Regions:
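General small-molecule cofactor/ligand-binding pocket signal
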Residues: 2-4, 190
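Active-site-proximal substrate-binding core of FAD-dependent oxidoreductases
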Residues: 14, 264-281
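A glycine-rich dinucleotide-binding beta-alpha-beta segment and adjacent secondary-structure elements
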Residues: 119-127, 183-245
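A conserved FAD-binding loop/helix module that cradles the flavin
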Residues: 241-264
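Glycine- and acidic
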Residues: 80, 152-162, 238-244
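Mid-domain catalytic core of redox enzymes
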Residues: 7-138
Length: 281
């Protein structure tokens, strides 16, 4: 196995009705007139968002058509706002994992899923990892991870920069924290980082900044995400939160196993069995 890190895939290369490998962006984004690095492959597995794979990494009209078909059937799942706070104080009322719920979940979900706006009274997940591992923060200090679900990015929404939604929404989050027992938190923040839906979209190529792939609304969509075998190319395979079986760490792991098994089946390679690889007798 050869791992190549710090390089973005610029496109999946297609020829004669199949994919033949991937092309990498130049180092530091500068080609200096040199051809792009190409990695040949008999099979390609994409763990990028399924819509982004079809729209941004493939060029065939059939891929664009498939992306539009997915967009008609599904909407992106919700996104999230993350605050990373380093504090010079500890708060004894929190454990490693903490939830602070909205007073009205119906209004919260209506804001996020129907109106497409940040929830006015959000549910918050707060992790204080130093409760389990004291080395995660200096003595007497705290490192907090704060996640608030919000709507995926709608047309015209600007999250980052002056006047953006992050600038407007962070006070809502901090106000709730003060009401949840972090009364003097503002004067104890020594390190602060934020991650917005726009940042998630850029970092992970996630459509609309969605953190759970495609939404599972409706009776059928929960169990019928896009298949692990691409409908466009027979030797292209899909995995991740927007592919079968869906989002969340356990199912994403299952998605990877399913995609790998599809490759093995299609290439007539015996599937692994517990304790070793199965072979014909």
């Amino acid at each position: 196995v050869n791992y190549i890190t710090g390089r973005r895939v610029s496109r999946i290369v297609e020829r004669d009705g199949k994919v033949i490998g991937v092309e990498l962006e130049p180092l530091n984004g500068q080609s200096n007139g040199k051809p792009a690095d190409f990695i040949a492959a008999d099979a390609v597995v994409s763990n990028c968002d399924v819509q982004r794979t079809n729209r941004d990494l493939l060029s065939a009209p059939a891929a664009r058509s498939e992306q539009k078909s997915i967009a008609r059937k599904y909407t992106p799942a919700c996104s999230g706002v993350v605050l990373y706070l380093g504090l010079n104080k500890q708060y004894n009322h929190v454990s490693h994992h903490n939830f602070f719920f909205s007073k009205n979940s119906h209004e919260e979900f209506d804001d996020i899923y129907r109106k497409g706006i940040p929830a006015r009274d959000p549910t918050m997940y707060i992790a204080a990892p130093s409760r389990s591992d004291p080395t995660q923060a200096p003595p007497g200090c705290e490192a907090l991870y704060i996640l608030v679900h919000t709507a995926y990015i709608r047309d015209g929404q600007k999250w980052d920069g002056p006047g953006g939604l992050m600038e407007q929404y962070k006070p809502v989050i901090m106000d709730k924290m003060r009401r949840m027992g972090f009364t003097d938190i503002d004067r104890h923040i020594v390190v602060e980082r934020t991650l917005s839906p726009a940042g998630i979209e850029k970092m992970y190529n996630a459509e609309g900044g969605a953190i759970y792939g495609l939404a599972s609304h409706g009776r059928m969509h929960g169990g019928f995400k896009p298949k692990n075998r691409s409908r466009v190319y027979r030797n292209l395979y899909l995995t991740g939160g927007s592919a079968n079986p869906g989002p969340g760490t356990p199912m994403v792991m299952m998605s990877g196993v399913t995609a790998a098994n599809c490759v093995l089946e299609d290439w007539k390679i015996p599937l692994p069995t517990e304790g070793g690889r199965s072979v014909a007798s």
